[in-house]
């Protein structure tokens, strides 16, 4: 887990309760290079955004960053995840408030290595967010 927030203590307690300490590493502030290294070695990127105190994840650049490495994402329906994830192809969109749905999506992608197929698609899908392609889209509009 990279980051911190009000739920950090609860998440750490849950990891301990489930005896998963050897499978989690909690990091707070890390460099961009370190973050990219962790993402590139992952099988799946999970950030089930929710509306919290009238605030929500905007575009979801983190999903694009993961896709650049061929890592599929699971994002919450609230916020900008659906702008960066093609549901059912480059990742999954779920209700970030529904733990069963989040688990089900994680399980689905990790079962039978489905994440590999999703990751390949994510790596090609993310090219639409490259500046040269965005500029071409603006030219069409103008």
Could you tell me what each predicted segment is?
Residues 40-55, 71:
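Acidic donor-binding loop of glycosyltransferase active sites
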Residues 1-11:
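Glycosyltransferase donor-sugar binding loop
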Residues 63, 68, 72-75, 85:
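Short hydrophobic beta-strand element within catalytic cores of glycosyltransferases
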């Amino acid at each position: 887990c990279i980051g911190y927030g009000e739920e950090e203590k609860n998440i750490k307690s849950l990891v301990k309760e489930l005896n998963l300490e050897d499978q989690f590493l909690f990091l707070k502030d890390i460099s961009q290079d370190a973050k990219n290294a962790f993402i590139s070695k992952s099988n799946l990127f999970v950030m089930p955004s929710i509306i919290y105190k009238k605030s929500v994840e905007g575009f979801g650049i983190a999903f694009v960053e993961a896709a650049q490495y061929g890592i599929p994402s699971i994002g919450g329906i609230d916020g900008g995840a659906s702008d960066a994830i093609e549901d059912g192809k480059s990742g999954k969109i779920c209700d970030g408030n529904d733990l069963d749905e989040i688990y089900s999506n994680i399980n689905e992608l990790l079962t039978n290595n489905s994440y590999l197929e999703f990751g390949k698609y994510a790596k090609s899908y993310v090219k639409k967010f490259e500046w040269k392609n965005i500029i071409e889209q603006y030219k069409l509009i103008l």
